[in-house]
Amino acid sequence: MARQEQRVSSERVGIFSSLVYPDYRRLWGATACSQAAVWALVVLRGALVYELTKSNVWVGLVTMAAQLPSLVVTPFAGFLADRCERRHLLAFTYGLNLGINLLLAVLVLTKQASEWPILVLAMFNGIIRSVEMPTNQALLPNLVPRERLLNAVALNQLMQQGARVFGPLCLLPIIRFVNPETAFVLSAVLYAIGWVQILMIRTASHGTIVAQQGILGNLVAGIRYIYTQPLMRSLMLLTLCHCALTMAYESAFPFVARTQLGLRAAKDLFEGPAYLMIGLGAGAVLGNLALARVGDQQRRGHLFLCLGVLSGLTPILLGWTTTLPWAMLAAAAVGASTSAFMTLSQGIIQTLAPDGIRGRVMSANTWHTQGAMGGFNAVNGLLMDVPWMTVPLLFGGTGMLFAVIMLGSVLMVHLRALYARGLPPEALAR
C-alpha cells in the first residue's frame, strides 16, 4: 500500500515543483545565466577563430581547450567541492569566469584578439568550469528533499541545455544590428547576474573528507566508487560513449553552416551556428520539460534505453538537411534526445552517490563527459579538414555507431535491469 501511494505521489510531480525551494530557485537562475554565457561563447569563439584562421582544426582546438581541462582539474574539483563550503566555492568560480569573459571582450573590441589568446582564455574558462560544474551538482541535492531530486536535476538540466536557446538568441540582434565583436560583452553580463544569484544562497553544504586517506586517497575516492559499483561503472562508460559520439558537435557547426546550408556571408559565419544552437536548445527545453513530469522509475528506465537509441539516430537526420529551417528542426530533435538522456544519466548518478563523496563522484562524471566531448571536438575538427569529409558522413557514422552501442548494452545485466525496472528501491530509500 505504501509503495502504491509513493508511486502515485511520484507520478504527480509538477514540472516546476522544485522551484518552490528558494535556494534551489537561486541556483537554477544562476545556472541559466552561466550556461547561456557558455553557449554564447561557444558560438562566438568558433566563428571568430574560423574568421581569423580559415581552419576547422583551429575551431576544434579552441573548442577542445574549453572542455579538455576537465581531465586534469575535475578530480581536484571534486575534492574541493567536498572539502570547502560549496556555495562559497561556486561563487568564487563565477567571479573568476566573469573576469575572464570581460578580458576576452576587451581584446575583441580593441582588435587585439588572435587565435592563441582566444585558445588560452578558452582553456582558463574550461579550468574554472571544471570546478564550477561538480560543485553545482554536489550542492543541488542539499537544496531540495530527496523525493524531488530527479525533478530538480531535470529542471537544472533544462536550464543547462535550454540555455542554448537563450544565449545564442540574445546574440542575434547584437550581431545583426551592431556587430559580432560587441556580442562578446553579453557573456560577461550573464555571468555577473549569475554571480549575484549564487551569493544569495543560504543553505550550507559540505562533503566528508577522510583525514587518514590523505589528499590522493580522497581525490580518487569518487573514481574508485564509480568503478567498484557495477551499475555506476556501466552507466559511466555508456555516458562517455554518448558524449563522444553524439554531443561533440560544437566545432562542426561552422562547417555545417558553410558546406551543408550554404551560409557563406561574413555575418552568416556567426549567425548560422547561432541558429543551429537555438534549435538544439529548443529541443533540449522540450525534452527536459517532458522528462520532469515522469516520476515513475520503471518508465524512466524504459525512456533511458529509447532516448539512447534516438540520440544516435537524430544526428543522422541533421546530417542530411540542406536548408536552415529543416536543420533547426533536426537540431531540435538532437537536443531533445541527447539532453534528456544526459538528464536521466546524471539523475541516476546523483541518486546513487553517497552525500559524503558526491562532489568527487560528480567531478569524475564531469571528467569523463567533458573529456570525451573536448577530445572528439578536436577529432571532428581534424576530420572536417579532410577533403572527402562531408556532414552526412561525419554525423551519420558517429550517430549510427552509438545507436549500435546502445542496443548492445541490453546484454549487460545491470543496465538491462535499469532499463526494465528503473533504479532499485534501496537506492531511492537512502
Role assignments for model-derived ranges:
Residues 30, 155-163, 238, 364-369:
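Hydrophobic alpha-helical segments of secondary membrane carriers
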Residues 60-62, 72-76, 83, 87-96, ...:
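C-terminal transmembrane bundle of multi-pass solute transporters/carriers
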Residues 9-68, 224-280:
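Helix-loop boundary and gating motifs at the non-cytosolic
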Residues 2-12, 148, 199-224, 419-428:
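Flexible cytoplasmic inter-helical loops of multi-pass small-molecule transporters
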Residues 45, 131-144, 340-353:
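Intracellular juxtamembrane helix-capping segments at the cytosolic ends
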Residues 115-126, 151-207, 249, 271-282, ...:
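Hydrophobic alpha-helical transmembrane segments
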Residues 32, 114-131, 326-340:
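Hydrophobic core of transmembrane alpha-helices in multi-pass small-molecule transporters
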